[in-house]
Amino acid sequence: MTKSELIDRIVTHQGLLSSKDVELAIKTMLEQMSQCLATGDRIEIRGFGSFSLHYRAPRVGRNPKTGQSVSLEGKYVPHFKPGKELRDRVNEEEHVPH
């Protein structure tokens, strides 16, 4: 699902807010979450999951085209850990292959 599809679903489901209001709310929420992670803070949404940063240590990688070794610096990457309610709900639903 894309961001615009999410906006359309919310507008259709609740019917009280305009598409522009829902779009602004989602953009604001995502911006705040991004800023929070950028400062190293953790985000927890009960029943859904938590977002945090994980550190990836420096390592030697390979250029897939040339096979040449490349030194990669250490970096922080966003990590999502689903909550128990989300895991349970996903496992209850029937999955249709894409």
Swiss-Prot record:
Disulphide-bonded residues:
none
**Keywords for this protein:** DNA recombination, DNA-binding, Transcription, Transcription regulation, Translation regulation
Coiled coil where? none
Cite the PANTHER family for this sequence.
Answer: DNA-BINDING PROTEIN HU, INTEGRATION HOST FACTOR SUBUNIT BETA
HAMAP family in the cross-refs: IHF_beta (MF_00381)
| InterPro entries tied to this protein | Hist_DNA-bd (IPR000119), Histone-like_DNA-bd_CS (IPR020816), IHF-like_DNA-bd_dom_sf (IPR010992), IHF_beta (IPR005685)
PROSITE patterns of this UniProt entry? HISTONE_LIKE
A Pfam family name for this chain? Answer: Bac_DNA_binding
Q: Does the keyword DNA-binding apply?
A: yes
Stated family:
Belongs to the bacterial histone-like protein family.
**Oligomeric form and interacting partners:** Heterodimer of an alpha and a beta chain.
Q: Which biological process, per GO, is one annotated for this protein?
A: regulation of translation
CDD domains to which the protein is assigned, alphabetical: IHF_B
What GO MF annotations does this protein's record show? Answer: DNA binding; structural constituent of chromatin
GO CC terms on record? chromosome; cytosol
Q: Does the keyword DNA-binding apply?
A: yes
Question: What is the primary gene name for this protein?
Answer: ihfB
- Role of this protein: This protein is one of the two subunits of integration host factor, a specific DNA-binding protein that functions in genetic recombination as well as in transcriptional and translational control.
What species is given as this protein's source?
Answer: Pseudomonas entomophila (strain L48)
Q: What is this protein called?
A: Integration host factor subunit beta
